[in-house]
């Protein structure tokens, strides 16, 4: 059997469908190129797009305006707070620096016032002394002296009789002796006082001598007392 086929191994047929060949589908009458213009929008779409852009712009403007205003307000507030704080610190520092100066000025004013008060007292005392000295000069040069003051002085001494014991002796200037005798002789005798003339006394003065001591009412003594009262600490 020479015409017989050679021996081959049997294999089953492939049951999978045959692969399809991809053929690009071309759109009918449509050619896409880079220069192809975009499709035109309708009026409604254009309006919506413009509104969206306006909203975006308004949002950006509002944000920028708010940011600028916030910065400005913050700057102004910071400036005012800094100014107030600086002013307060400056005032406190100025008060601290001026406190010693103010205290020194108060001390100077007080010392100046005390000086004026002392000067006023000295001036018044000096004027009083000058007036008393002028009066003494006038009285010393006057030939006639009014004895009314001496009479009143002796009457006051008589009212102080309980201060004297025994028989007090009243001495006056010899030129005043007659006037005192005429005015108070009887009263002096009634009280047991003795009247004597003393040339060492000035006109208008008198002295009372008793067991307890002397009471000096002479012009010289009264003059010294007036000067002492007019200028305390000087005499």
Swiss-Prot record:
Q: Which Pfam families match?
A: FliH
Name the GO cellular-component terms.
bacterial-type flagellum; cytosol
Q: Main role?
A: Needed for flagellar regrowth and assembly.
Subcellular localization, as worded in the UniProt entry = Cytoplasm
Report the InterPro entries cross-referenced here.
Flag_FliH, Flagellar_FliH/T3SS_HrpE, T3SS_Stator/FliH
**What is the protein's species of origin?**
Salmonella typhimurium (strain LT2 / SGSC1412 / ATCC 700720)
Q: Which molecular function term from Gene Ontology is one that the record holds?
A: cytoskeletal motor activity
| Protein's UniProt name | Flagellar assembly protein FliH
Per the record, the GO terms for biological process are: bacterial-type flagellum organization; bacterial-type flagellum-dependent cell motility; protein transport
What family does the database annotate?
A: Belongs to the FliH family.
Location of the region described as Disordered in the Swiss-Prot/TrEMBL record: 1-22
Q: Which gene encodes it?
A: fliH
Keywords associated with the record: Bacterial flagellum biogenesis, Bacterial flagellum protein export, Cytoplasm, Protein transport, Transport
The question of whether Protein transport is a record keyword is answered with yes
């Amino acid at each position: 059997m020479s015409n017989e086929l050679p021996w081959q191994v049997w294999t089953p047929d492939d049951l999978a469908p045959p692969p399809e060949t991809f053929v690009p589908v071309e759109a009918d009458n449509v050619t896409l190129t880079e220069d192809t213009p975009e499709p035109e929008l309708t009026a409604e779409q254009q309006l919506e797009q413009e509104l969206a852009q306006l909203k975006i712009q308004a949002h950006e403007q509002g944000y920028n305006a708010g940011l600028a205003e916030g910065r400005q307000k913050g700057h102004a507030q910071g400036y005012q707070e800094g100014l107030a704080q600086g002013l307060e610190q400056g005032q406190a520092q100025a008060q601290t620096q001026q406190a010693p100066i103010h205290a020194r000025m108060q001390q100077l004013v007080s010392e100046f016032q005390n000086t004026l008060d002392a000067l006023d007292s000295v001036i018044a005392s000096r004027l009083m002394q000058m007036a008393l000295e002028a009066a003494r000069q006038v009285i010393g040069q006057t030939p006639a002296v009014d004895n009314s003051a001496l009479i009143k002085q002796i009457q006051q001494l008589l009212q102080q009789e309980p201060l004297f014991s025994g028989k007090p002796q009243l001495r006056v200037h010899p030129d005043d002796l007659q006037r005192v005798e005429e005015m108070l002789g009887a009263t002096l005798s009634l009280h047991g006082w003795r009247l004597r003339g003393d040339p060492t006394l000035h006109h208008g003065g008198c002295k009372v001598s008793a067991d307890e001591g002397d009471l000096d009412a002479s012009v010289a003594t009264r003059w010294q007392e007036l000067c002492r009262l007019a200028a305390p600490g000087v005499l």
